[in-house]
Regions:
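Membrane-embedded catalytic cores of phosphoryl/pyrophosphoryl-handling enzymes
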Residues: 3-5, 120-222
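Short helix-capping/hinge motifs at transmembrane helix termini and TM-loop junctions
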Residues: 31-34, 76, 102-105, 157, ...
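N-terminal transmembrane-helix/juxtamembrane module of multi-pass inner/ER membrane proteins
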Residues: 1-68, 99-129
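Membrane-water interface at transmembrane helix exits
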Residues: 39, 74, 95-103, 153, ...
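Aromatic-anchored segments of alpha-helical transmembrane domains
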Residues: 25-29, 89-97, 168-180
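Interfacial segments of alpha-helical transmembrane regions
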Residues: 10-18, 69-100
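Membrane-helix interface segments
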Residues: 49-50, 77-81, 157-163
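Hydrophobic alpha-helical transmembrane segments
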Residues: 58-77, 141-146
């Protein structure tokens, strides 16, 4: 298992190197600022273009995107669809357990930064009526995004695909902070769950035998 994990990290080394840089950036932010100050620091760099980009990009980390990825993989190989489904399911369960059971009382920016939102200090994109209140830690969208793009990178094996995947994952994770839906600590842990969980699932399942049907797809059922 350990050798398989190391092999997969080496296979998509660029993905994991960029991710390591992203983690180090988050660690610096988390040590340097309080969670509200970190949000205010990032918030000052807003722009109309980013408002539109992140508003729609954030949807790539939701349940429907993960479901679509599994559906598409069914047309490639059943085995790949199973790997993705297990990966998305395991990481989502871990995040939802932490979010809804352990850290259920952790408030979102709408509550923690109510004053700044209403005195004009904080630039917001999402309407107040659509802002979430509870279950801030960890970020479910970030978990999903890193799980989705980690699996796609590992399935591809091409380094440039891995680079594109980690860029998308990072941008989706950051969108949660940009849109004032989460704090940096939420996306930090969410990204860890999504990446490590998916790497472990992939490394465990990839060499399992599924019989001939595992190599088949919806395009080749005979």
């Amino acid at each position: 298992m350990i050798l398989s994990i190391l092999k997969n990290i080496k296979k998509q080394l660029l993905f994991f190197l960029v991710y390591a840089v992203f983690l180090m950036f988050l660690v610096v932010i988390l040590f340097k600022y309080s969670k509200t100050d970190a949000t205010l620091w990032a918030n000052q760099y807003w722009s109309p273009f980013q408002d539109v980009m992140y508003k729609y990009m954030t949807y790539l980390g939701d349940f429907w995107t993960a479901s679509l990825v599994v559906l598409v993989l069914l047309f490639w190989k059943f085995k790949y669809a199973i790997i993705a489904m297990v990966s998305f399911g395991v990481t989502a369960l871990i995040t939802q357990f932490l979010k809804k059971i352990i850290y259920y009382d952790v408030k979102r920016p709408l509550i923690e930064m109510w004053e700044q939102m209403h005195d004009g200090t904080l630039h917001t994109v999402v309407d107040e009526a659509d802002q979430l209140i509870n279950y801030s830690f960890p970020s479910g969208h970030t978990t999903s995004a890193f799980s989705i793009f980690c699996i796609l990178a590992l399935l591809s094996k091409k380094k440039w695909v891995g680079f594109v995947c980690i860029v998308f994952a990072v941008l989706i994770g950051y969108s949660r902070v940009y849109l004032c839906q989460h704090f940096y600590e939420d996306i930090f842990v969410g990204s860890l769950i999504g990446t490590i969980g998916s790497l472990l699932v992939y490394s465990y399942i990839e060499n399992k035998t599924f019989g001939n049907w595992g190599e088949k797809s919806l395009l080749n059922l005979k």
